[in-house]
Amino acid sequence: MEFDPVKINTSSIDHVTILQYIDEPNDIRLTVCIIRNVNNITYYINITKINPHLANRFRAWKKRIAGRDYMTNLSRDTGIQQSKLTETIRNCQKNKNIYGLYIHYNLVINVVIDWITDVIVQSILRGLVNWYIANNTYTPNTPNNTTTISELDIIKILDKYEDMYRVSKEKECGICYEVVYSKRLENDRYFGLLDSCNHIFCITCINIWHRTRRETGASDNCPICRTRFKKITMSKFYKLVN
């Protein structure tokens, strides 16, 4: 049985997208909840809603040697901490349609999907995930030029952001010398990018520098190379992503 996108109903609750695949003639109903995490630019899929047994099996699997090794390698390859490869939404009245264990899509496609014994459900799940990613990553469009990105391009884009995150998490501010991603306050864990050079600063330090220069009547120069800048861009990465 082939996957048919026409049979997908899409809705959302808060930051969760809910995909319902309904094929009544074949008595197939599958609900997939997906979170797109903007902090590490990836997707997390609710395996509890697919089948509660999958969540229990996953928790047991990741405690075994094979599971631990896979999680370690995935964390290294994506630059995402192991603890951030999964997310949980609590079961309460507000979250009754979206609660459960969400895991990195790589774990679903390459590990969990093999635990599903129904090959038709396997095929539909894979189709739903690929369909969602393909339809939620687009190139900029103009009225006369509508272009969607291929699945291969999507993977390249995700890899690009993951590489950017991996490099960014090691960068230190050139003023306070702290690792930007390790600063105590969450609002400080951003870079302040200058339009004049590539020196690295956290957003807090460079804003204080900029404000002090303005108050004293001094020119807006980079604290390191003294090149004049016109603007500061707040960014989660150490440089702008094209």
Curated annotation (Swiss-Prot):
Belongs to the orthopoxvirus OPG021 family. The keyword Metal-binding applies. Its EC number is 2.3.2.27. GO terms for biological process: protein polyubiquitination; symbiont-mediated perturbation of host apoptosis; symbiont-mediated perturbation of host ubiquitin-like protein modification. Residues 21-131 form the KilA-N domain. RING-finger E3 ubiquitin ligase which catalyzes the formation of both 'Lys-48'- and 'Lys-63'-linked polyubiquitin chains. Plays an important role in virulence by acting as an anti-apoptotic factor. Its main location: host cell. A zinc finger (RING-type) spans 173-226. InterPro entries: E3_ubiquitin-prot_ligase_p28, KilA/APSES_HTH, KilA_N, MKRN-like, Znf_RING, Znf_RING/FYVE/PHD, Znf_RING_CS. It comes from the Viruses. PROSITE patterns: KILA_N, ZF_RING_1, ZF_RING_2. It comes from Monkeypox virus. Gene3D superfamilies: Zinc/RING finger domain, C3HC4 (zinc finger). It is found in: Host cytoplasm. It catalyses: S-ubiquitinyl-[E2 ubiquitin-conjugating enzyme]-L-cysteine + [acceptor protein]-L-lysine = [E2 ubiquitin-conjugating enzyme]-L-cysteine + N(6)-ubiquitinyl-[acceptor protein]-L-lysine. This is Host range factor p28. The RING-type zinc finger domain is required for E3 ligase activity. Keywords: Host cytoplasm, Host-virus interaction, Metal-binding, Modulation of host cell apoptosis by virus, Modulation of host ubiquitin pathway by viral E3 ligase, Modulation of host ubiquitin pathway by virus, Transferase, Ubl conjugation pathway, Zinc, Zinc-finger. GO terms for molecular function: acid-amino acid ligase activity; ubiquitin protein ligase activity; zinc ion binding. GO terms for cellular component: host cell cytoplasm.
